[in-house]
Amino acid sequence: MGLKNINFFPTDHMKQNLAYMHERAPDGKLSIRPAGHLLRKPLTAKTPEEIKSTFNAGGAGCFAKPAEYAQIIATLLNDGVHAKSGNRILKKETVDQMFTNQIPEFPDFGRQGIDPPKLDLSNPLPELYPQGDLPQGWGLTFFLHQHPGPTGRSGTTGWWAGLPNLFWWADREQGLGGIIASQIVPFGDGAVMGLWGTVEAGLYQALQR
């Protein structure tokens, strides 16, 4: 895929362009987070021993340039083929399986909220993606819808989020996906989530023109 800026251990070049971690106070003001980045060890690990002793979580911990992360989303939309290079990264059946609900017997699993949270890391969220009492699903790697969302996304859309208020989605049915990326805690920031909804809804509206 030719991606240069995605890594669990940022290169020196990536560190030079690293966005500062911010936090929003209860009064709405933003400031640089005094404790620094949420993941300090990958940023400071240099020796083979330090790197080996660093835990890389499967669902979090990747540093990336949003434009390059978007190419991964586009590859999922294109049934596993990286459109820019024409290289097949995943088999279509693998992508199909990723977007198949693996836990139909647990329709409420995905809606488990964050309450009470650690207030320096997350706002209270009763649900991650409120849809009333409609069943929701979970693929091999992300939250899966079973019904259309209010922005226009299809009922087969996959999506997930990162703690510093990063939100991505991939709607294979309509061939549309994207990412909203910030470096702001706590999670569930109203301004960022509002921007996410506005941008996503605008894209779907543009498709209908």
Task: Label the predicted regions.
Residues 54, 159-162:
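Short, glycine/acidic-rich beta->alpha junctions
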Residues 164-173:
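Short, surface-exposed beta-strand/loop micro-motifs that present aromatic residues
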Residues 151-158:
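Short, hydrophobic/aromatic-rich segments at coil-to-beta transitions
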Residues 184-209:
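Generic C-terminus detector
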Residues 162, 181-183:
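Active-site-proximal beta-strand/loop segments in catalytic clefts of secreted hydrolases
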Residues 136, 162-164:
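Residues that act as N-cap/strand-start positions at coil-to-secondary-structure junctions
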Residues 1-149:
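Short, surface-exposed loop or secondary-structure junction motifs
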Residues 168, 177-180:
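Short hydrophobic-aromatic micro-motifs
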